[in-house]
Amino acid sequence: MSIYDTLNEQQKQGVFTVEGPVLLLAGAGSGKTRVLTHRIAYLIEEIGINPWNIMAITFTNKAAGEMKERVEDLVGFGSDSIWVTTFHSTCVRILRRFIDRLGYDNNFVIYDTDDQKSLMKDVCKRLEIDTKVHKEKTILNAISSAKDELIGPKEYYQNTLGDYSKQKIALAYEEYQKALKNNNALDFDDIIVKTIE
């Protein structure tokens, strides 16, 4: 009996289609992870793809761990070479190798929420921003939203011309990014932004 015999027809189509992209749309618990793990096994065992040339990305560490276990059960030897990680873990792995191209050292640090707040407090002090009017958390949230849209400090500044309050945030954003770089640091949003850059 083959490991693929337990799959339904739609799942088999997802596993055995190797040319071009495959989009899996299905509800929770319907077997999407099963299709992905069996597809990985199929690519290695039947198509001859090297495990280190396969990447499977998930949203959570829990899902990545579960997928890694399932792939290991199906593939066995060589499964540890497959990239089964979250988006952020994948990006950090790429950045550790290539971030020097953006002017950072490869041993960069990742700032957590407390580090970010502390840095923003310093930025606000330097720029004489009244934190009773412009709270650090509000500024950091605005910066995070901008980064989610891949809007850098200069573009953010241009987009806020004429709005005094947002201009203050724009100035803080620019200074915040400079301070991060001077500290050879990234915040959580930068992990994806810098990988794209």
Set out the residue ranges of the language-model regions.
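Conserved RecA-like helicase ATPase core segment
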Residues: 3-6, 32, 36-38, 42-43
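Short amphipathic alpha-helical boundary/capping segments
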Residues: 1-6, 126, 130
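N-terminal hydrophobic alpha-helix used for membrane targeting or insertion
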Residues: 1, 28, 176-178
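Walker A/P-loop
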Residues: 20-38
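N-terminal pre-P-loop "Q-motif" helix
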Residues: 3-19, 188-191
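A basic/glycine-biased coupling hinge at the interface between accessory DNA-binding modules
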Residues: 19-21, 41-196
